[in-house]
Amino acid sequence: MKLWAHRGCSQRYPENTLLAFEKAAQLQGLAGIELDIQLTKDGQIVVIHDEKVDRTTDGSGWVRDYTLAELKRLKIDAGCYPHQVIPTMEEVFELLEERLKAGAEAESGTGAGAESGTETGTAAGTDTGSKTGSKPGKMAGLRLNIELKNSILPYDGMEEKIIDMVHDRGLEGAVVYSTFWARSLEKIHYLDPEAELGILDTRISDCMYKLKGGCGATALHPFWRAMDLPAEQLRGYTVRAWMSGHLYPEKSTGTRLKMEWLEELGITDLILNEPEVYLG
């Protein structure tokens, strides 16, 4: 089972912030980080889940009605940590680029053995080389699941912008694109036929319906409690299930899921708010 950080380590730290992503990147054996993107009024890609800023910042209103400079003035409460702001996608790439490039090399088979989602590495995310044959100190690979938040409010040109950004940094192999909107995946597939795509929905049967419709997806991204297809029907597919549940500053329930049971349902990857419970 590969584990991904849902909006970073979003149970203990504010979701979709550089702080949450930095904490996630420190986890030994983490496969990747999931995040959400939207466009500002002036066409900049920012990382935020909700279409409005009300829940996660001290502001109010639609993300699309703010310029980047205006969004940067909004504060995100981070408790005892320095206050956070809504990050741009460029800032996230700058933070994680070295790890993502190692992940891209691992996916393409050109790296020196760095591999995400394994039991190698240290708490700081470096590979000791003891199990993969890589050189001591090599950064362990990390991948990024970029969800385009365009199923409620379509953002014209967001697909082109994010693909260009990923290609400019040479991170194609480190990125999975996902969205609830099948047409957006079709567009990404047209723009970048080699891109890895995941189709989102609540029930896995609805994910499969969209996939069969020709959206170009190779992975199914259902809610983990909505596995309404038999595991036999899911063989050969990447099933990257997502969780909701508690987010910062809510208290953790401390519940640990039984991974063997989830694998029996056909789930191959799990995107969760508190990956540190399993990997820390």
Report the location of each language-model feature.
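Phosphate-group recognition and catalysis centered on beta-loop-alpha active-site segments
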Residues: 1-110, 122-280
